[in-house]
A protein has these predicted regions:
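Conserved functional loop/turn residues at catalytic and ligand-binding sites
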Residues: 94, 215, 263
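Non-catalytic positions within long, well-ordered alpha-helices that form the structural scaffold/packing
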Residues: 79, 179, 260-263
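Alpha/beta catalytic cores of group-transfer enzymes, especially the acyltransferase/condensing modules
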Residues: 12-14, 41, 103-249
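Structured loop/turn residues at beta-strand edges in well-structured enzyme cores
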Residues: 3, 85, 181, 218-219, ...
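FabD-like malonyl-/acyl-CoA
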Residues: 1-141, 154, 185, 189, ...
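A short, acidic, amphipathic alpha-helical segment used as a generic capping/interface helix at domain edges
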Residues: 247-264
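Charged catalytic carboxylate motif
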Residues: 29, 66, 70, 170, ...
Length: 297
């Protein structure tokens, strides 16, 4: 029987202190994931995940491997319990692409943990500018606003829900112009850099050696790429995707539509929170979006 399931994995912003703690206390499979990430990084990140403080967890260099570890812990328990069907495709929102690749057997957990830790460190080091979320404005209008003010569209999250990245002064101009053009709301995001923009080019170049050196296998199901929504299986193409997505827009609307075209009708959001499960039905009405966290108790 052909699968109608997509595994999708969240990105930054889905973290909270205490995530995965109860699960790790009762599940050896979950505990093994957190221990493996601690070992790979050489320090007890799990202590920060489970007990905080929040200001330590929210740091990009901790947040990225923390979300990866928690998501894979959830995944390990669901697979052990037989509660997660095989996928027709996998996808991840930004950071979530690494988690998707681990789950799909393309990338080892330890390698992914080290890469995303370094990715977070580099993003902090090169953290210039910021991001704003724009609600209630057509994408075409917003792209005009971006061109006119010198910012870049970072994330196409859902129809009428998009984020911009750029230098602070340019973002202020973009926010004002977006409101003038009809945006319902513009919200400054609590991030320390202009993610998914050309300002992140030094991050991509510095991370390139790690990504190119990491052993990569063909995933059990194609990864729907954030950059252009193509289904990827070839390890070299996947490496290129992981580098390009640092500076390119996350085209999540196109990713979800491509997954639907690929046969996905049930989207399992594997990780903390339910942000993606809120976005997906707005992109493709009628599909089932299941956040797994509540299923784990």
């Amino acid at each position: 029987m052909v699968s109608d399931v997509a595994w999708v994995f969240p990105g930054q912003g889905s973290q909270r202190v205490g995530m995965g703690k109860a699960l790790a206390e009762r599940s050896a499979a979950a505990r093994a994931v957190f221990e493996a990430v601690d070992d790979a990084l050489g320090f007890p990140l799990s202590q920060t995940i489970f007990d905080g403080p929040d200001e330590a967890l929210i740091s990009t260099k901790n947040q990225q491997p923390a979300i990866l570890a928690t998501s894979i812990a959830y995944f390990a328990v669901l697979r052990e319990e037989g509660a997660l069907p095989d996928p027709v495709c996998v996808a991840g929102h930004s950071l979530g692409e690494y988690t998707a690749l681990v789950a799909a057997g393309a990338l080892e957990l330890a390698d992914a943990a080290r890469i995303v830790r370094r990715r977070g460190e580099l993003m902090e080091e090169h953290g210039r500018g910021g991001m704003v979320a724009v609600l209630g404005l057509d994408d075409a209008v917003l792209e005009e606003v971006a061109r006119e003010t010198g910012v870049e569209v970072a994330n196409f999250n859902a129809p009428g829900q998009t984020t911009l990245s750029g230098r602070s002064e340019a973002l202020e101009a973009a926010a004002a112009l977006a409101k003038e053009r009809g945006a319902r709301r513009v919200v400054t995001l609590p991030v320390n850099g202009a993610f998914h923009s050309s300002l992140m080019e030094p991050v991509a170049e510095a991370l390139r050696p790690m990504i190119e050196a990491a052993p990569m296998r063909e995933p059990i199901a194609p990864l729907i790429a954030d950059v252009d929504a193509r289904p990827l299986r070839d390890p070299d193409e996947i490496r290129t995707e992981l580098l390009e997505q640092i500076t390119a827009s996350v085209r999540w609307v196109e990713v979800v539509r491509a997954a639907h075209d690929h046969g996905a009708r049930r989207f399992f959001e594997i990780g903390p929170g339910k942000v993606l499960s809120g976005l997906i039905p707005r992109i493709v009405p009628g599909v089932e979006a299941v956040p797994v966290e509540p299923l784990l108790g």
